């Protein structure tokens, strides 16, 4: 039992030891991806990666993972909103169509227009 507790603690230390930027909203997620992708692209384009390059990649992936998780959560919610619109259209529920439709359109418009970072 103690071994599993120690293993769990070690796993947490391994995966939560680098500072990262949170993505509280879709715009922040997009901007973090844009910025950190540039750094990742410049490193991965090198013929040979140094140990420092690999450490930098390790560090920046935490921020990229946070951004991707935010986008996944927002897209999942957009899918739920769209399904609500679909089902409400079958039941002729105007208020649900308008409310859920607005949420869906707001979320997807951010995807289509791209934020100004």
Region spans (language model):
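Long, amphipathic, charge-rich alpha-helical segments that form helical bundles/coiled-coils
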Residues: 56-96
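N-terminal signal peptide c-region/cleavage motif recognized by signal peptidases
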Residues: 4-8
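A structural signal for alpha-helix termini and helix-coil/disorder junctions
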Residues: 46, 63, 70, 110-117
């Amino acid at each position: 039992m103690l071994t599993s507790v120690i293993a769990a603690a070690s796993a947490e230390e391994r995966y939560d030891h680098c500072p990262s930027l949170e993505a509280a909203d879709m715009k922040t997620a997009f901007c973090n991806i844009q910025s950190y992708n540039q750094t990742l692209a410049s490193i991965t384009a090198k013929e040979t990666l140094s140990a420092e390059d690999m450490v930098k990649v390790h560090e920046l992936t935490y921020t990229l993972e946070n951004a991707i998780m935010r986008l996944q959560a927002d897209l999942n919610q957009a899918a739920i909103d769209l399904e609500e619109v679909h089902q409400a259209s079958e039941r002729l529920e105007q208020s649900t169509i308008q409310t859920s439709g607005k949420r869906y359109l707001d979320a997807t418009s951010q995807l289509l227009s791209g934020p100004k970072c």
